[in-house]
A protein has these predicted regions:
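Short amphipathic alpha-helix that is part of the acyltransferase structural core
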Residues: 1-25
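Extracellular structured ligand-interaction cores
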Residues: 28-30, 116, 154-156
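A short catalytic or substrate-binding loop motif that flags glycine-/basic-rich loops and adjacent residues
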Residues: 23-27, 149-151
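Acyl-donor binding region in acyl/amide transferases
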Residues: 5, 46-149, 159
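A conserved mid-domain beta-alpha-beta active-site/ligand-binding segment of alpha/beta enzyme cores
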Residues: 146-169
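Conserved beta-hairpin
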Residues: 15, 28-45
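Short, cationic low-complexity segments
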Residues: 169-203
Length: 203
């Protein structure tokens, strides 16, 4: 297996067909997992929608380093493919970066892929309702306060990508306690979606 950069457009069919959210996030970086020259998975990273989130992790001074691992889609979720894709795509990101990601409890996700790749666990968000902008749109685009959308609890993970000095500095600046990993049964979901995969001509 090999992880390579791909165009963000190549990730779109995977996100819309294979990911449960069915919504396009902000994409700054996209990478593909190739097995025998066939694209079998994608991962994307983008700027978080919440500026307060970016400022809150390590402070305003480091908010520009924050990036969210916002989509991870695999063709068949074969053993170790998800952790391999996460670990090796992070290596391709510029340094330093503060990588955040979430495991949605409503989807039965615990975040074992993040635990396997040495992310730090920083707690769980509370269930809440937000203003809704309609299906497939982020709540930041909402304008009608009477239209509400349920937000499930999510496990929050963070990873510091950089050299030893940068990683130590960022971890010291972390404004959250590092907590023991959550445990529980992970549910597998099948979106039923299909994507046409492109063969890699040259490796």
């Amino acid at each position: 297996m090999i992880v390579l950069p791909i165009k963000s457009e190549e990730a779109v069919p995977w996100i819309m067909q294979k990911h449960y959210a069915k919504r396009l996030p902000s994409i700054s970086y996209a990478f593909g997992l190739y097995k025998e020259k066939k694209l079998v998975g994608i991962i994307t990273y983008g700027i978080p929608a919440s500026n307060s989130l970016c400022e809150g992790i390590c402070g305003k001074e480091y908010k520009e380093f924050v990036i969210e691992l916002n989509r991870l889609c695999l063709l068949d979720n074969a053993k170790n493919q998800s952790s391999y894709l996460v670990a090796n795509s992070i290596k391709l990101l510029p340094k330093p970066k503060i990588v955040v990601s979430y495991a949605d409890t409503a989807q039965g996700h615990v975040g074992y892929v993040y635990q396997a790749t040495n992310f730090l666990f920083r707690g769980t968000t509370k269930e809440r309702t937000d203003m809704s902008a309609g299906e497939g749109k982020h709540s930041r685009h909402a304008t009608d306060p009477s239209i509400r959308q349920f937000r499930s609890a999510k496990h929050r993970y963070v990873y510091f990508h950089g050299n030893k000095t940068e990683k130590k500095l960022l971890q010291r600046k972390l404004n959250y306690d590092v907590l023991p990993y959550p445990k529980g049964e992970t549910k597998q979901y099948n979106s039923g979606g299909k994507v046409e995969t492109q063969a890699l001509l040259f490796v």
